Amino acid sequence: MPQMAPINWLILFIVFSITLVVFNILNYFCFFYTPLKTSQSLNIKFNKLNWKW
């Protein structure tokens, strides 16, 4: 069974690296973050305590 030539491994590594970088760039820049309205959705009641020492 013949082995792959080193230039073939190099091309395979370069293609894999370029694919990985392009995939990561597309995932990073194509992410649309839509934050929820935190003031309306969260109703947190705070108890204001006046400490008398």
From Swiss-Prot:
The keyword Mitochondrion applies. It comes from the Eukaryota. Keywords: ATP synthesis, CF(0), Hydrogen ion transport, Ion transport, Membrane, Mitochondrion, Transmembrane, Transmembrane helix, Transport. InterPro entries: ATP8_metazoa. It is found in: Mitochondrion membrane. Belongs to the ATPase protein 8 family. This is ATP synthase protein 8. It comes from Anopheles gambiae.
